[in-house]
Amino acid sequence: MSAYGMPMYKSGDLVFAKLKGYAHWPARIEHMTQPNRYQVFFFGTHETAFLSPKRLFPYKECKEKFGKPNKRRGFSAGLWEIENNPTVQASDCPLASEKGSGDGPWPEPEAAEGDEDKPTHAGGGGDELGKPDDDKPTEEEKGPLKRSAGDPPEDAPKRPKEAAPDQEEEAEAERAAEAERAAAAAAATAVDEESPFLVAVENGSAPSEPGLVCEPPQPEEEELREEEVADEEASQEWHAEAPGGGDRDSL
């Protein structure tokens, strides 16, 4: 015991160390840095802090009280190390192996009373207890997160090309052209079928199919009609001369 009634510790002693905002943590005394101030090594997180004796509790006497399971990251690993590997160093078990543990995240600690009570990483870092450096995103990782809201995500589906309507119009134009060509071919076929009849009529010959075109009058019929007309005219002249003609004088 010290002159102040506080227990005295030596290097290698196992204790529970209490930081404000954290549970009583399994730790090991490294050495005394100044009167009533100890540097302690935290099991599970491999960080260090400078604490006064009033924040340190003997491990064996307080094991049942403070050694209950805790969901904070690194606590279960710390209990295992203090029992099975109490001489572990920071380089023996990298802190990165703790990232995959299922102990859950650490809650934010309360403000410490002094700078000397803040835990520091055994490798020289100044992070909080139970929060490894790897959990903090770097500036390079934060860079992509600063993308403006107007920029579309890279995985977003691309908009359909504007050339699609043009292709549809071209297809419609091709279909219309094909329809026009088919209509022209049908019309040409119809003209070819009617042309023999027209040629036959123009040449004065009878068409190959009767009944489709009126036959022109035959020359013999015209001559007969002309003869009939001439006979009628001659008969009329004879009857006109008969009543008062020169035949009476001859009689």
From Swiss-Prot:
Signal peptide: none annotated. GO terms for biological process: chromatin remodeling. Residues 218-235 have a biased composition (Acidic residues). Residues 11-62 form the PWWP domain. This is Hepatoma-derived growth factor-like protein 1. SUPFAM superfamilies: Tudor/PWWP/MBT (SSF63748). Residues 128-144, 155-164, 236-251 have a biased composition (Basic and acidic residues). Residues 89-251 are annotated as: Disordered. It comes from the Eukaryota. Belongs to the HDGF family. GO terms for cellular component: nucleus.
